[in-house]
């Protein structure tokens, strides 16, 4: 049975040539899938695909089901690696990471991110808006940048009530309760860093989730998107823990579909309700403007130059909006930490065809944070 899927019709020869040149030092990669083999070779100005050939500098073995998931953008190679559903017979993780953006382009037409192609259409990545702006202006900024900062969406009183409810849920949380994420502090203590499925346990937070202001912003790009309070961790609250921690309080550069599901999750839109303000000292959001809808190297900081980065500092009651495949990070606070953000996400209807309650990747690894954290 043939392994190599047809090349996506959206492939631009110039983009593929530039990507192939970057793979020169990495060399060819072979996939052994049950009894079949396929090898991808950087052959500037393109990539050569050879069925039955197994002489790549990197050799990856996986099952047919895993290969199909990779090609169809249901699971990423990182997901397969963590799940031990792929093994390296030659080469390793770094070589697979080098090939990953190119394979996504060939298989699904998702172009490799290149800062030289960044086009902000004259817009300012640092712009802040209010709800007085019309939907067309807000949508245009979100479409170009992949993120949006809207000030003073909620009042201080509304945020005080929400924070009191977060205090209540935090007091009830325990490691291993399957409704929270925890990290280990420098002193060896466990510290709460995320509450999940919060609106199933709080009418106060459920009201925020369903607030017309949240819906307006979440549906700017696609009015058919839907809330998913009972799956994908529902609406979650991030709590930034200060200092060096082991676990997933400080999340490195990533796309929210980085573990898989791009074909069914994207373009989801995530609303960040700023329960507290955020800045570098408390732990803020960093983004690569205009990186959404593209594939980026897992360690892009080591292999790409000139990548624009924006820090999104906020006040209590502000809202951030980001397309889920935007490249973004939640770095370690430089000071006291303490940022609280409630994330409410709107998904395409295809989600309900594939992922039920408790079936998302995070549901499966929530209590295995040390394993996931080794990718930082």
What is each stretch, according to the model?
Residues 216-222, 244-313, 351-359:
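Catalytic core of non-heme Fe(II) oxygenases with the double-stranded beta-helix
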